[in-house]
Design a protein with these regions (language model features):
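Elongated, amphipathic alpha-helical interaction scaffolds
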Residues: 156-158
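Switch/coupling subdomain of P-loop NTPase systems
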Residues: 173-175
Length: 175
């Protein structure tokens, strides 16, 4: 019996969960691990929500699952997402000789908020640097899930890093 910090009742089923459960994909060594959880039975299928059209997809093993989602631009492996974000942070920050503060809680949260991380370097008007850095930092980290950037004197800059979910293919993000 798992208890979520915040959960909701979905549909007419007697189950509280963080998100709606539609299926349980459970395969190991190319075999379905059969079990029931409330109103659901495990199988080798799941529902894919693509362009607001729900489709049932079957998988023979984890490799086929991971391959399918990779083609969709989704990194299933949390460690791969984490390493990609770290690598991009380092690349951007080392070019500018700047840094971010260690905030593993925020970093772990962001790793789990995205499927296909896209790191963006953003900035705000320098006039807002008159606001105490503690307030700027708290606001960016707690409310916006951004990573404020600091110079080598430990002063906050008007730049910050964000981790977006997927690349902006249509050019809608203006930085």
């Amino acid at each position: 019996n798992y208890q979520w910090k915040k959960s909701m009742k979905w549909g007419e089923f007697d189950l509280n969960w963080g998100r709606p459960l539609k299926s349980i994909l459970s395969i190991f060594d190319k075999k379905v691990i059969n079990f029931r959880f409330h109103h659901l039975s495990s199988s080798n299928s799941t529902y894919i929500d693509k362009d607001f059209e729900e489709k049932k997809k079957f998988f023979k093993d984890f490799k086929s699952y991971e391959k399918y989602f990779k083609k969709q631009g989704i990194l299933v492996d949390q460690e791969k997402r984490k390493k990609l974000i770290e690598r991009e942070f380092l690349r951007i920050l080392s070019k500018k000789r700047l840094s971010i503060k260690d905030n593993s809680k925020l970093f772990d949260e962001v790793v789990n908020l995205v499927d296909n991380p896209n790191i963006l370097l953003c900035s705000f008007n320098k006039k807002f640097l008159s606001i105490p850095k503690e307030i700027l930092t708290l606001t960016m980290q707690s409310h916006q899930k951004y990573f404020p950037i600091f110079n080598n004197k430990d002063e906050i800059t008007n730049e910050f890093l964000i981790v977006a979910n997927k690349k902006d293919q249509k050019g809608l993000i203006k930085i």
